UniProtKB/Swiss-Prot annotation:
Residues 150-208, 209-267, 268-326, 327-386 form the LIM zinc-binding domain. InterPro entries: Tgfb1i1/Leupaxin/TGFB1I1, Znf_LIM. Residues 22-52 have a biased composition (Polar residues). Residues 19-52 are annotated as: Disordered. This is Leupaxin. A motif (LD motif 1) lies at residues 3-15. Belongs to the paxillin family. The modification Phosphotyrosine is found at residues 22, 62, 72. Interacts with unphosphorylated ITGA4. Interacts with AR and SRF. Interacts with PTK2B/PYK2, PTPN22 and PTPN12. Interacts (via LD motif 3) with LYN and the interaction is induced upon B-cell antigen receptor (BCR) activation. Interacts (via LD motif 3) with PTK2/FAK. The LIM domain 3 is critical for focal adhesion targeting and the suppression of paxillin (PXN) tyrosine phosphorylation. The LIM domain 3 alone or both LIM domains 3 and 4 can mediate interaction with AR. Expressed in osteoclasts (at protein level). Highly expressed in vascular smooth muscle.
Amino acid sequence: MEELDALLEELERCTFQDSEEYSNPVSCHLDQQSTEESKIPQTPKTLSSQGNTSPLKVQLVYATNIQEPNVYSEVQEPKESVLPPKTSAAAQLDELMAHLSEMQAKVSVKADTSRKPLPDQQDHKASLDSMLGDLEQELQDLGIATVPKGYCASCQKPIAGKVIHALGQSWHPEHFVCTHCKEELGSSPFFERSGLAYCSKDYHRLFSPRCAYCAAPITDKVLTAMNKTWHPEHFFCSHCGEVFGAEGFHEKDKKPYCRKDFLAMFSPKCGGCNRPVLENYLSAMNTVWHPECFVCGDCFSSFSSGSFFELDGRPFCELHYHHRRGTLCHDCGQPITGRCISAMGHKFHPEHFVCAFCLTQLPKGIFKEQNNKTYCEKCFTKLFSQ
């Protein structure tokens, strides 16, 4: 495609500069003119042939660089250049080459001794550069003029044929490439960063955020949590593997958990039902309790007075605490909180340890037993000595 670049250079120029040896070229557009007629006078503005008073139209081929004040006559009706159809760059080049072959039979052009042989197809870029040098003189002689479509932002040369507009500039298709891998972008989607173009693969690999789970680039939706980025499908509970729903997640030791697993694994457990304590709770016996679970271990009544008794890590009301410890009075059935008397495998309040017959308090714990009852010595003798 470098041939098209050369085309643009002279398509852009309306006149060409040449060396002194081409100061008097043979024009392919002036037929039947003698050598004397080809000389350009300095004062007249038109050229006329002998025997013909009407002025001849002169086609401007190119301007020269001669230091002498010789000037070509003005072109009255310049001949339009035959432009190739704007179908494709390859079609334009083919038509141009055919036109050159036809004109070479009429125009005498000095051979270019510096012309190099074309390399093979494997070195096609070097071949195009060589063709540019070969075609430059022929294009100047033909006077082909074309309006370029712009200048390539990469090579700074005119663009003919296909053109790509991107990043606010124009490019040859073969020059609009990925900054990293140098692959042609063409009409493929690309990404811009700092004024440079990247293909999708390289852009995501170089600049896209990485998933904290799989470490792959995130090319679509990105989820940000725990100061990291994630693929939405890779942000899930560390215990059960379920993707988090609307209820969100809980974090523990830099790992995300769903609410169910977090509470089951890390929230404090109720000392009564062993389920997680979520809201209101009571703290007692170095653990937490649901209010409805903090009750007597035997009668399951709540502690309305605010006091309880602990036995074997469980709370009890006063009555059942003493019952389990065997400190209920055998006579009245009430807890014994002070002094007590132990007799017949039971405990008694001192005031309740009395004779079963006369109901007098047995002094100093001296008593007689009959049928699991206590008697004072006097009543026992009276009732059972006969």
